[in-house]
Structures are given as structure tokens and as C-alpha cells.
Amino acid sequence: MKWVTRAKVKVDRVACPWLIRTFIDRDADFLFVPVDEVESVARKTGAIPYDVAGVELGHHGEECSFDAIVKKYNVKDKAVDRLALIVRGADTPRRDLTPESRGLEAIAEGFKRLAAAQGYDDQETLRRERHLYDALYLYCGGDAEKLRRD
């Protein structure tokens, strides 16, 4: 599967690829483009758009894109449900939704600044933050056997 979203990833646009590669498609490809190009790139490449306004796998009401993907792909995992609350709090104005949400938002902002300072791209951000989400998943009671080993 191929996916596309806005460039300059943070929280939801990092958590969603982690979710997809862990529970839906381990070989998923992700494209990061300027927001005004997401729709056209999705059409041209057949990529599934996420975390942009007006798409199925975006924010709806108080929920974020992570929630939408969990529902659409029927991910049934209690630790993912708990992680979804943390991500939702970090990615929406509801920072107090969980005690961990503010911390995740702060760490995500730090990674964003690190990427800007060191000049690495969104793919590298995904690579660097993958273990953060693995750790959060285990903190939420997840099964280590479900995590990618590559």
C-alpha cells in the first residue's frame, strides 16, 4: 500500500505510519508532499491520503487520523486503543486528555526541531521515532511480538 500526507511530519503523521506498518501493512510506502499537492499525488499514484482536511482518514470531530485508521482497518488491540488516546491528546487541543499527551507533543516538537536543525527528511523522522512508538505501545500494555523486527 502507498500512503500520502503533508510534509514536515509531527505526532499524527508519525504515529499513523507506525500504526500502519505495525498492524496493517509492514511494507507500506509513505509519501510526504506540500499540503496543496496531497490530492493530486494521491490521484496520480493511487496513494491513500491521510491527515489532511477533507479526507476519510483525517480528523473528524475530536478524533485524529490515528483514530480514523484504527476504525477503518479494524485494528483490535487494547494497547492501540490506549495509545490512540495519547496520540489524540498530543495532536489536538485536548493536551490534558491523558497524562502522557503533553509529553508526546513535547517530544514530537523536539524531533521536528531536530530534523530542521540537522536537515533530515520525513522518512528519517519516521525511522528515528519508530522506537518511541514501539516503547509507548509496550507502555500501554502491548505485545512485543507484534512489533516489527527489521
Regions found by a protein language model. Name each.
Residues 1-8, 17-150:
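Extended, well-folded catalytic/binding cores that form a central cleft or groove in large enzyme
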